[in-house]
């Protein structure tokens, strides 16, 4: 059981290298490298743009008192898809593109929705207090008294 992560990493690297060699054989090495860089740029922009858009949508649902769990699952799947596209390799790109498909996102939402709980805190996160305690409201005015000051002669020569 403790060898399972090592075997999984080895299989992942083997699959990525095998696919990379096959694609480079068909398209050429330069075009293959350009394709890998292109998918990384797409992944980076996807994480930045779609993640922020879904975060705003989640906040709107929470403000309306609705359950934002579906948007949370969609946001997480978009972020994971973007990260998979960001990693170099065609196998991770394929998995990332799968997570971008709406039927896959819907299937994930249906499977994960029963495991998520949503609760809303009444009154928001912060309260202003009831005004109790020993707080007094008042005004003051500063008056300088000349008697409290010592006169000092300046003997310096300019």
Swiss-Prot record:
Cite the residue spans of the region called Disordered: 125-158
- Which stretches are Cytoplasmic in the membrane topology? 1-16, 100-158
Q: Which residues lie on this side of the membrane: Periplasmic?
A: 38-78
Q: Where is the composition biased (Gly residues)?
A: 125-135
**Does this entry carry the keyword Repeat?**
no
Mind telling me which Pfam families this protein's record contains? FxsA
UniProt-annotated location(s): Cell inner membrane
Task: Tell me a GO cellular component.
Answer: membrane
Q: How does it sit in the membrane?
A: Multi-pass membrane protein
Q: Where are the transmembrane segments?
A: 17-37, 79-99
Which residues fall in a compositionally biased region of kind Basic and acidic residues? Answer: 139-158
Q: Does the keyword Protein transport apply?
A: no
Main localization (coarse) = membrane
Query: Keywords assigned by UniProt?
Result: Cell inner membrane, Cell membrane, Membrane, Transmembrane, Transmembrane helix
**Database matches in NCBIfam families:** PRK11463.1-2 (NF008528)
Say what the protein does. Overexpression alleviates the exclusion of phage T7 in cells harboring the F plasmid.
> What family is this?
Belongs to the UPF0716 (FxsA) family.
Name the UniProt record assigns to this protein: UPF0716 protein FxsA
């Amino acid at each position: 059981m403790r060898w399972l992560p090592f075997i999984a990493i080895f299989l992942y690297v083997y699959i990525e290298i095998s696919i990379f060699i096959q694609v480079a054989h068909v398209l050429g090495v330069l075009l293959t490298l350009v394709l890998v860089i292109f998918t990384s740029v797409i992944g980076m922009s996807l994480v930045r743009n779609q993640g922020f858009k879904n975060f705003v949508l989640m906040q709107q649902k929470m403000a309306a008192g609705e359950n934002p769990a579906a948007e949370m699952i969609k946001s997480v799947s978009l972020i994971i898809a973007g990260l998979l596209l960001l990693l170099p390799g065609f196998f991770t790109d394929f998995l990332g593109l799968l997570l971008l498909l709406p039927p896959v996102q819907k299937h994930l939402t249906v499977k994960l929705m029963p495991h998520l709980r949503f609760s809303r805190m009444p009154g928001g996160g912060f309260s202003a207090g009831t005004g109790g305690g020993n707080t007094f409201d008042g005004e003051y005015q500063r008056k300088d008294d000349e008697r409290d000051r010592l006169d000092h002669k300046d003997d310096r020569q300019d």
